[in-house]
Amino acid sequence: MELKDVQAIDTMCRVFYCEPEIVKPHFDFYEFRTMAYGTFGGVMKKLGIAPGEEWKVVASLYKPSFEAMLAEMDEIGVEKVFMDATKMWSFRHKALMADYSLELVADRVRQGKGRVVGGLSYNPFEIKKSLEDIEKGVKEYGFKYVWFHPISFGLAPNDKKCYPLYGKCLELGIPVTFQVGHSAEPLPSEVGHPMYADEVAIDFPDLKMVLTHTGWPWVEEWISMLWRHPNVYGNIGAYFPKDLSPALVEFMGGRGQNKVLWATNGFGLTRCKKELVELPISDGAKRKVLRDNAANLFNL
């Protein structure tokens, strides 16, 4: 398969992928600063990033403008990218450390003229407003999904504070996507164990769910969830395809090829697509992961 053979769909890009400087305020928070020196410590050193400029370590992965992102999409064969109104809670500071607005995402969707798929997010400490925003985003702006970061709120996906979200997504007929696995930021990650989604999948059998971020370090459990539940899918965002576990690659190329979605988490469309195309799986499986599964799941 050549790079442009499939017009891919990135099911978890980020609003800041085309505007790097908007991540600056995140690095006022302990979690993001610590992530820079931990998860991204090698990159920090390689790029010679100085204290106080930690935001540049993630910005180095992004494009300088919306136009540059569209040009990259055209160059490598990416038809659509997903962007959501991300909300994340600081465990240390007890405040939202990421809080993107519905309106910002709507602007990205308008700019994209069909190339950007809009999504909402969820704050379980502001349930009423979150549900109102989700309904508005879907009904007025045509947004297609919700992405939720339960780990940052200290909640497992089966916590009762999350259930209003699932009910609303089911009512609106949209998938819910949420992070499982550990968090790159220093957040208590036990609640990210993929098996906590088991009860949700059973309680909401008609709700389409996407478990994001591969579930690492519990990849086998993530695979189990996708394989056992007809309504559960997963994406590989935040991990470069060449670094995926052999078990995940085997699953993606075999019995799980209809359940896995391509995603970058803003880590670079070109590198992430190139490495996916180079994986030792069939072209048919690659096509499903890069495009077909997303098109079917999100009714694109």
List the predicted regions and their residue ranges:
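Generic structural signal for well-ordered alpha-helices
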Residues: F66-L70, L102-V109, I134-E135, C162, ...
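Short, solvent-exposed loop/turn segments at secondary-structure junctions
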Residues: R14-F16, T86-S90, N123-F125, I151-L155, ...
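Short aromatic-enriched loop/helix-cap "lid" or pocket-rim segments at secondary-structure transitions
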Residues: E19-P25, K94-A95, L131-E132, S189-E190, ...
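Mid-to-C-terminal alpha-helical segments outside catalytic/metal-binding sites
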Residues: M1-T11, C18-E75, E79-K80, K136, ...
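Conserved, mostly hydrophobic/aromatic
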Residues: M12, M73, V105, G137, ...
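Active-site gating/metal-coordination segments in enzymes
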Residues: E79-F178, S183-A184
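Catalytic pocket-lining loop regions of alpha/beta-barrel enzymes
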Residues: E140-F148, G154-L261
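Short beta-strand segments
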Residues: D10, K80-A85, S121, V210-T212, ...
